[in-house]
C-alpha cells in the first residue's frame, strides 16, 4: 500500500435530518398566555458502524417549553451524519465519533429546531453551544462506574 492509502482520512459523506416532530397540545390558547415559557433541553448522541470505515452519528434533541404547567410546544429532532473514517487508531476513533462528529452535526440540529419553533408561531429560542467533549467524558465516567459496580457484585447483580 502507498503512503496515501495509509494516511488518516475523515470525510463527511452526508448530513441529514433523520426525524423531527412538533407538538402544540395547548394551541391556540397557549398563544394568549403572557408569562414567559420555561424551556427544557435534552441532547443525546448515538453512533453506529455501518461498514468497516463508515459511521452514522445521530444527535438527538428534545426541546420542551411550558407556560405554568401547560406545554406550549414539544420538539423532538434527530440530526444525522454519515462519516467515512479510515486509518485512525482505535484509541482515537471513539473520541472522534463521540466528540468531533456531534460537534459538526449540532449546528444543523440547532438551526432545524429554531426554524421549527418560529414556524410554529413561537418566539425564537436559540440553543446554546454544547461541549461534546465534556459530555463524552461524563459518559465514559458513567460507563466505568457501571463496569466497576458490576465487577464487584456477585452473580452480575449491581450493588446498591
Curated annotation (Swiss-Prot):
Pfam families: SecB (PF02556). It is found in: Cytoplasm. Gene3D superfamilies: SecB-like. One of its GO terms (cellular component) is cytoplasm. The keyword Transferase does not apply. Its main location: cytoplasm. GO terms for biological process: protein folding; protein tetramerization; protein transport. GO terms for molecular function: unfolded protein binding. InterPro entries: SecB, SecB-like_sf. Homotetramer, a dimer of dimers. One homotetramer interacts with 1 SecA dimer. HAMAP family: SecB. Belongs to the SecB family. This is Protein-export protein SecB. It comes from Burkholderia multivorans (strain ATCC 17616 / 249). The gene is secB.
Amino acid at each position: 500500500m502507498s503512503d496515501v492509502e495509509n494516511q488518516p482520512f475523515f470525510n463527511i459523506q452526508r448530513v441529514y435530518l433523520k426525524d423531527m416532530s412538533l407538538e402544540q397540545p395547548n394551541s391556540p390558547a397557549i398563544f394568549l398566555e403572557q408569562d414567559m415559557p420555561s424551556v427544557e433541553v435534552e441532547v443525546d448522541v448515538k453512533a453506529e458502524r455501518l461498514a468497516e470505515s463508515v459511521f452514522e452519528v445521530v444527535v438527538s434533541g428534545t426541546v420542551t417549553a411550558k407556560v405554568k404547567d401547560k406545554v406550549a410546544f414539544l420538539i423532538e429532532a434527530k440530526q444525522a451524519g454519515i462519516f467515512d473514517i479510515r486509518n485512525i487508531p482505535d484509541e482515537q476513533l471513539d473520541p472522534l465519533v463521540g466528540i468531533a462528529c456531534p460537534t459538526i452535526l449540532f449546528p444543523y440540529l440547532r438551526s432545524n429546531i429554531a426554524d421549527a419553533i418560529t414556524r410554529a408561531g413561537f418566539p425564537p429560542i436559540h440553543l446554546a453551544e454544547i461541549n461534546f467533549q465534556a459530555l463524552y467524558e461524563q459518559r465514559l465516567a458513567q460507563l466505568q462506574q457501571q463496569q466497576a459496580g458490576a465487577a464487584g457484585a456477585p452473580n452480575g447483580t449491581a450493588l446498591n
